[in-house]
Amino acid sequence: MSPVPSRGRRLTAATSLMLAITPALAQDPAPIKVPTIEQLAAYPRMTGFSLSPDGKHMLAIESQGDVRNILVWQTANLAAKPRVIGANNMRIQSASFLKNDMLAVTMTQPYDARLGGELTKTFINKLLVTDLAGKTWKEPLEGADIARSEDVRRVNALAVPSVKSRMPRDPDHVIVESDGLGRERDLFRYNVHTGEAARVLRLGENDLDALVDASGKPRAKIRGGIDAKGVYVATELRNAGTGQWDEHFRSYVKDRDVVEIASLAAGPNTVILRSNVGRETAALFEYDTEARKIKSTLFEHKFFEAVGTRNLEGDDAVDADSLVAFTYQGLYGLESHWLRPQFEAVIKGIAQNLHLAEVTQPLVDVGSGKRSEVRMFDGASVEITAYRSGEVPTYLLRVTGLTYPTEHYLLRGQTLTLLSKEYPQIDRRALGKSRFVYYKARDGLNIPAILTVPNPALCGPGPYAAVVHPHGGPWARDNMAYDASGWVPLLASRCRLVLQPQYRGSADWGRTLWMAGDAEWGQKMQDDKDDGAKWLASEKLADPKRIAMFGFSYGGYAAFAAAVRPHGLYKCAIAGAGVSDIERIWARFYTNPFFRDRQAPTVKGLSPLTQADKIQIPIMVYHGDRDQTVPLVQSEMFVDKARKSDQPVQYHVLKDYGHGPAWTREVMAQQLKLIEQYLAQGCGGSGL
């Protein structure tokens, strides 16, 4: 299912990258422009910047409406017109360099299939390899001997291989992992120029994953199993002497202990281990594979989860000398703790150039209650996304914030160039101001939250109409990077204050908050959201008579729960793709032992469907017809029953909308328009 390449002929002003950097003004006298629905729903104008391994080329994805093209420049001559690579049959999702002269491109398109006699509407993705001009296209493993039967071969036609290692020191090969519904995963050494593939590891039916070193040799394997204590995940390392797989760690999923290899780049007999065993948050450790013991703690953050490593060559498994940072889940998502002063100096220099002030941010350890303060930039983060050394050191940088639409910069030598404003038409003054806060739950637990307050110059003084906006998951979390879904920018620019509570059950804020949500769906988890609404009113940030709840996925479940709980806090609710029957949604996953053992004790509590005919407030429900994560029936059942209540119910099915991704910008805009109109005119008839 390869696309027909379409090498674009028309270029826009956005493809000329030598743009002047305009310093931010303390006060802009121009009138504040409220972003339109179409501007909020648009794809980023230009995004996905990356550098070739040798730093000589740079690529990005440019969007014009629903059309997305790959642009490729010579880094030393950005003023020249880039090569433009497009696709006719599928839509480009992402692109990156595999080698100096070859790209990996992911594509997507709607797909209808009959599975088990029923029509399934979904999306399919494809991984393709092409050259820098987009002349030749290959589908990795298309001809590899990976199918066990003709039936399995048909199923595997829908599978999406993934690049496991780019092997930066090999000019031709990468490691690709096959992935299909009808077979286990295998690892292949794939030649990006010839398309030839050779299997390097056949994984067994209980093998979950594998890691390879810089030469492409499998060195670690993750295996699942069941013993007397329950379902476990074991980490195995290949014995250099015997070639056998030796088990080093075993953790039980019901305990939610994490013991995993974060990097193989520490040396031949050393790995970097990530573990939260006996800890509030995960940390990184140096582990001696021969002595089978932890040698030292490499990195820990007292308030955030450590994640992994970064290095110079853009591939994790190179060597210890290339490590430049440890990563952690910070306020803006994945952030870096730099090991070399030069990178921190670059970031501070960029922030000064952009007039980003430093502020003091209080932090609280939810588990212990201990407090501290850190310095951070006000309203945005600056992150180095790529670096290449050489005669002219070259950096790619990203600047982003919840009220600061993402921007991309190139620092080459001493020259700083603005590459792209992802949403150039959005006036960020209309988006208000965001900050990270804590509030107390009724049982005393500290609840982290992100608060976005409308701009008084646009909306006047508070208290404001407010929306409590819980994230999905629930084992997930929010961050303060720009919200490309458009939800928070839409609400804030329409003068609604937004609270994003990191309620109990949220992940990556530490073990205490994560596990406090067990078996508390619609109960203490919901109390946390309600306590956030009460806090907004007590702080005189929100008008207590003008508070609504809006969420998607698990957040949609929370909106259903808000509608049926008799507390009188909310004027109305909006549920996007919400779960209404937790027993039915749980039954879909119960046959998976890992999901069952890990989440069975946690997915218990209120099932809103049981009380849908007694909803207490007006509600709008919307759901995509291609959603294969939360089936459409979850909304249909709730709406059918809720219409028997005395409250107004709106219901909308969005065509070609999955569990989040919209196939066209028109559909994306339709979703945002529904939210805007409901809060302006619905919500019981008079708006919020």
Model-assigned labels for residue ranges:
Residues 423-545, 552-553, 585-588:
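Cap/lid segment of the alpha/beta-hydrolase catalytic domain
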Residues 13, 26-381, 386-395, 402-403:
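Beta-propeller folds
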Residues 500-688:
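Active-site-proximal cap/loop segments of hydrolase catalytic domains
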Residues 12-22:
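Bacterial N-terminal signal peptides
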Residues 2-14:
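Bacterial N-terminal signal peptides that target proteins for export
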Residues 328, 400, 469-473, 553, ...:
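Glycine-rich His-Gly loop
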Residues 397-398, 402, 441-447, 525, ...:
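C-terminal substrate/ligand-recognition segments
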Residues 402-437:
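An N-terminal hydrophobic leader/cap segment in hydrolases
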